[in-house]
Amino acid sequence: MDHNAALTTCSTSAIPRLARLATERIAELIENDALPEFDHKVIASCSNDIFEVLRQKKKLNHQTLQTMCSTSRFQINKIDLMGNKVELQDLELCSNQNLVSFRLGDIDYFPNTNKIQVADVLDTALNRTSRQQLRHLDLSGRHRITSNWPTYVARKLPRLESLAFANRSTANETLSQIGASLLNLRFLDISSTCVTDISCISSLRNLEVLIMYNLNILKGDVTETLSNLTKLRVLDISRKVNTDYLQETSQDAHLDLALGIYNRSVEAIESGTATPWAELRAIDMSGLSIVQFGTDRALAFVEKIIEAHPKLEQISLLATPLDSSLIEIPNRNLQVINTVSRRSIIFALSHYANLDRPAFITHALHSVYYQLQSGYDKFSQEELKECLRLVCISMQQGLNTLPVQIAGSACLYHLCKMKRIKRLSVKEVNNCIERSLDAAEQYRSMTQLQKNVWLTICNDYLLHLDEIDFYRTCKVALDTMLLNRDASVERMTIAIVSIVTPKMRPSEAKILTTETKYVYHLVKIMNDYLEAYTREHRVGHERDNENALYTLKFTLSALWNLTDECPATCKAFLDAGGVQIAFRILKAFDYHGNVQTKVLGILNNLAEVEELHLGQLCKNEYISVLISCLDGSFNEVDSKGRYREVERSYFAAGILANLLTNTDGWESENQRDEACEKLLELIEQYPTLPSAMVSYKSFIPFSRIVRESNSNGAIMWCLWGVHHVLQHREKNKAPTYEKGYIEMFMDSGLSPIVEDMSHGHSKHIHNLDIRVVHLAREIIDIVSCHSLSSSPVRLVRRV
């Protein structure tokens, strides 16, 4: 088939960039069932490209096939279903197109047997015109198929020139039928089948391409058989290898094809005649031990084959004794595929990336890895981009092969490591992330692979790009966290969750936070690392202590973000015993304001959920802890310019403000009054911060308190929070509100209430504290100035 052509060049797409973008966009519309109606017909080449994009994304299903095949809008003549879960009824849609090429893959169709019924499938998928004109048929795949299909093919597909059935458990009998009936074949791929004798194909004298990768030929005169195929241009006799030792993996005795070709080459040179393969352009000998020769003798062996075939343009010697040898033949323009240099390694990967050769792909990826590890700075920008593209293709095509994923993910780590990632475009970074996440999903329990993946993604630059799929990244990280308890993997996945959760769209975050299992697990981790930290702190293991603290801090950040405006997640945190653990952390880390701030942020989110009725937070013991967190040295600035003491106090105040609004549950009225007075006293002491300390998805956390509370202290906290984000609105955009904080304020319904408060009026508080009044006036002034300068917002002044 076309995709197996052995003569390759460094794969750069011939499709213009604009056409490629259009192709991908149309495929996306089809995938989302959002393709608009249009009258014109899309030509075959473009239709085929769109179909291929959907195939590579594994999005071929009944809906997408119906869109592409049921109407005459798309003119498809090549259909490839490999790697997609397609059922027999879906194949009926393919019959609406007139095809010249068809690749089946593995479908779930086993009526009364455990084999794919090839004749039924082809009858369903191919209409009369397709059967008359079909030239390429690929039946390669892993499932078993019926053995009598060559008879059907010979009878129904008269113009067939190219046939592949690699990886099927097909034996000599089927090949005999092909040799007897399909005499017009020019291309044949029988790789990794159960064929042990190829004598029967000597009748296929029109063959130009013969692919026999990983074939155990045990009998027959192979050299004589191949000698009858005088039109051969491409011959693949490569074998799967153990890439650690460069040895053929099969221990079975098999005929040495390379030795036969060598002997004929020597005979031809000595007699001054041509070999039977005078038209040979490419030969693949990768993985062969070359009859156990050493490097010098192996080189002489290969040179004889090259000398005897003057038209030879390409020879593949990957994973052979000549893998790292420089082979140059005077006066010959010969492409040697091995790993002798950086350029040849990239070429080798481009040659095998789209072929089903996982052992060779893995071998090439290992070589890429070592080049990146030891000589990254030697890569030109073009080489780097080509290398990245090929690694991603290899990982996508070899998703079911663990060695490919481990080697590929290691390459991606070196390509994205630290500042190196800035040499890549956003689209290339996205490609890295998608391939990494695919690997992480496929192999949850493979710790080394998981380390590679999360080391790659745990990159500050990468995680702050707006264009990446934060939802999928977070989801895969959370799932990995559940299933892989390696400490370093756990630490990285939790860190990533803590960073990307606030970047998700509200609809995506809502889907994710309905999975309460994540919260239960994070609460458990929170408890485990609290105990680990206190234990290591006691025995003086500073390094383990730092690791425990690092993980605990990111766990708290993740929970803080997951519980934000999400009642279901807050309830799960409560049910998992998170409140008790949170207060234990507050006590254990009374010297560590950053940790306390994160805990208080979580408790603040819980306190905002009115339906939870958090009376348990009003215990004297808990209230005392919260009040103690209010005080601090508010003018102190840390090395990063942050007012940590203000942050801690603000979130402690938020919890108390919510508890003061809910009058039930307080064990001591004096403690309640103390909390209210403390809020007024300390919030007034907050300095004007140079930058935003917090951001809000909405003003819902403030609305209920401002509307219902009879506590001056609670109102004071709300107004300070609103004032703070309005004050820094230019540089601190509302994360999920496109219009901005001024419009959020107006839409929240707070405006008229705050307007009343600025005049000293409140429905719920008889004596509104003057400090609250002053803060309300400052908010109204900010909104009024904005209204006058840049916005149609109007405030209604009440007197």
Curated annotation (Swiss-Prot):
Region described as Interaction with elc-1: spans on this chain: 1-131
GO cellular component: Cul2-RING ubiquitin ligase complex
GO process terms (BP): anaphase-promoting complex-dependent catabolic process; anterior/posterior axis specification, embryo; embryo development ending in birth or egg hatching; meiotic cell cycle; positive regulation of metaphase/anaphase transition of meiotic cell cycle; positive regulation of proteasomal ubiquitin-dependent protein catabolic process; sister chromosome movement towards spindle pole involved in meiotic sister chromatid segregation
Assembly behavior: Interacts with elc-1. Part of an E3 ubiquitin ligase complex including zyg-11, cul-2 and elc-1.
Job of this protein: Acts as a target recruitment subunit in the E3 ubiquitin ligase complex zyg-11-cul-2-elc-1. Required for metaphase to anaphase transition and M phase exit at meiosis II. Regulates polarity establishment.
Similarity comment text for this entry: Belongs to the zyg-11 family.
Name recorded for this polypeptide: Early embryogenesis protein zyg-11
